[in-house]
């Protein structure tokens, strides 16, 4: 958008309009200072200049005062609330204090003070630009729990003081087939919470920050009684395993589900499956996780995938498998564990291509599918179910100044099972030197 305007002998002022065209307004300039003020406004805020040109010039001093007030109001509309978070500036992934502005609260927006934010493996990939799409500076975080501090005039679902959550995305078109079916998570123009672009083209910044402004449609109610630190990872990890279990019928009492991997996703999957009343077998390459799976998480069986005897004994017994592992691993042998027509759902995303010969799935009519988080309807249902059954993630709570160490540990899988940042209890710092 151009930031220049021209004055003509007819005292007409031309400046860029918010819609991309040219807006022309008559302004009888009777004061040189008014001209200078408008020039200054136009160089910093065309929209503020547009407002200022409607002021008459019968009283230059009053005009200047009103124009400055209009500029201040316009600045609030354009830049919103000052915020501070921790951002990565390059692919070193190192996070440090970062000052920026949240958008101004609109009629259908909810303003949230961030209390806790989980750290997801996706955050690690983003800050290190592992996927080549990082938009630095980037404030990570999409497992957000907080308290409502303000609502727009049109908000009907929330009020100040409500405990709420925000997950992986904060926008969708709400007109496509996926949105119509309640799967906003598959909307082709979905706006992700961090390292995305909103519909106005601005970069989205996540929950490693003190506050966030979100359209009420994408805000979730956190049930009373759930520990907020343990609830935060449910906004991503929880719905990522809950949603496909419901979609594929792996939520029926008495059915047998296999859970591959016992990490951040896997341990939550075991909790949900047991709450559904299912028979649960944890499948792992690590025999040392047996006790954790059986005694602490309540799984019914533990299967070492490298043990041919154990694999043979369990062949054809499972109604479905939820594969939560994000590292490459042999998958063909796992299909032998499933009954005919059963599905293996991938919620982890190894970067190396899977090796899957057709004979692993064709003879039994077995299927392979994937899942990415869940829609708003499923996410709220997941939180409500978690509240009823007391399900939370197993977490290690940290302060923000430990976040870089936590990222290093996460890269080594040195966490049981999720890191959660106590944002409200941290000193976020911030110098004001890098506002956007």
Curated annotation (Swiss-Prot):
Q: What class of enzyme is it?
A: oxidoreductase
Query: What pathway, per the record?
Result: Aromatic compound metabolism; phenylpropanoid biosynthesis
**Gene Ontology molecular function:** cinnamyl-alcohol dehydrogenase activity; coniferyl-alcohol dehydrogenase activity; zinc ion binding
Q: Which residues bind Zn(2+) 2?
A: 173, 176, 179, 187
Q: What InterPro entries does the record tag this protein with?
A: ADH-like_C, ADH-like_N, ADH_Zn_CS, CAD-like, GroES-like_sf, NAD(P)-bd_dom_sf, PKS_ER
Enumerate the UniProt keywords alphabetically: Lignin biosynthesis, Metal-binding, NADP, Oxidoreductase, Zinc
* Needed cofactors: Zn(2+)
Q: How is the cofactor bound?
A: Binds 2 Zn(2+) ions per subunit.
Q: What does this protein do?
A: Involved in lignin biosynthesis. Catalyzes the final step specific for the production of lignin monomers. Catalyzes the NADPH-dependent reduction of coniferaldehyde, 5-hydroxyconiferaldehyde, sinapaldehyde, 4-coumaraldehyde and caffeyl aldehyde to their respective alcohols.
Q: How does it assemble?
A: Homodimer.
Could you identify this protein by its name?
Probable cinnamyl alcohol dehydrogenase 8B
Source organism lineage? Answer: Eukaryota, Viridiplantae, Streptophyta, Embryophyta, Tracheophyta
């Amino acid at each position: 958008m151009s930031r220049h305007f021209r004055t003509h002998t007819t005292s007409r002022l031309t400046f860029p309009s918010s819609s991309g065209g040219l807006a022309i307004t008559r302004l009888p300039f009777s004061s040189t200072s008014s001209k200078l003020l408008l020039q200054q406004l136009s160089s910093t805020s065309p929209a503020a200049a547009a407002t200022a040109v409607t002021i008459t010039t019968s009283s230059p001093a009053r005009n200047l005062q009103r124009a400055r007030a209009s500029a201040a109001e316009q600045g609030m509309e354009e830049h919103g609330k000052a915020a501070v978070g921790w951002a990565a500036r390059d692919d070193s992934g190192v996070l440090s204090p970062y000052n920026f502005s949240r958008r101004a609260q609109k009629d259908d927006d909810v303003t949230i003070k961030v209390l806790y934010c989980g750290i997801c493996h996706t955050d690690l990939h983003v800050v290190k630009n592992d996927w080549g799409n990082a938009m630095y500076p980037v404030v990570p975080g999409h497992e957000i729990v907080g308290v409502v501090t303000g609502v727009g005039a049109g908000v009907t679902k929330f009020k100040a003081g409500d405990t709420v959550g925000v997950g992986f995305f904060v926008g969708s078109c709400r007109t496509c087939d996926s949105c119509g079916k309640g799967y906003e998570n598959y909307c082709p123009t979905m706006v992700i919470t961090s390292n995305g672009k909103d519909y106005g083209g601005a970069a989205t910044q996540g929950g490693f920050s003190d506050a966030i402004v979100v359209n009420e449609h994408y805000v979730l109610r956190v049930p009373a009684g759930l520990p907020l630190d343990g609830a935060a990872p449910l906004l991503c990890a929880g719905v990522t395993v809950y949603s496909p279990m419901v979609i594929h019928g792996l939520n029926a009492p008495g059915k047998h589900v296999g859970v591959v991997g016992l990490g951040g996703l896997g341990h939550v999957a075991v909790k949900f499956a047991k709450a559904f009343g299912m028979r649960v077998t944890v499948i792992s390459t690590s025999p040392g996780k047996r006790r954790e799976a059986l005694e602490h998480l309540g799984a019914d069986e533990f299967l070492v995938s490298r043990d041919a005897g154990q694999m043979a004994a369990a062949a054809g017994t499972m109604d479905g498998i939820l594969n939560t592992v994000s590292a490459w691993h042999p998958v063909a042998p796992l299909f032998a564990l499933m009954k005919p027509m059963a599905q293996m759902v991938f919620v982890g995303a190894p970067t190396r291509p899977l090796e899957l010969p057709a004979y692993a799935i064709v003879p039994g009519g077995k299927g392979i599918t994937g899942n990415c988080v869940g829609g708003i309807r499923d996410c709220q249902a997941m939180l409500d179910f978690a509240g009823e059954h007391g399900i939370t993630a197993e977490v290690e709570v940290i302060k923000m100044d430990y976040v870089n160490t936590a990222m290093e540990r996460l890269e080594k899988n040195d966490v049981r099972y999720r890191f959660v940042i106590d944002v409200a209890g941290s000193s976020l710092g911030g110098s004001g030197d890098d506002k956007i």
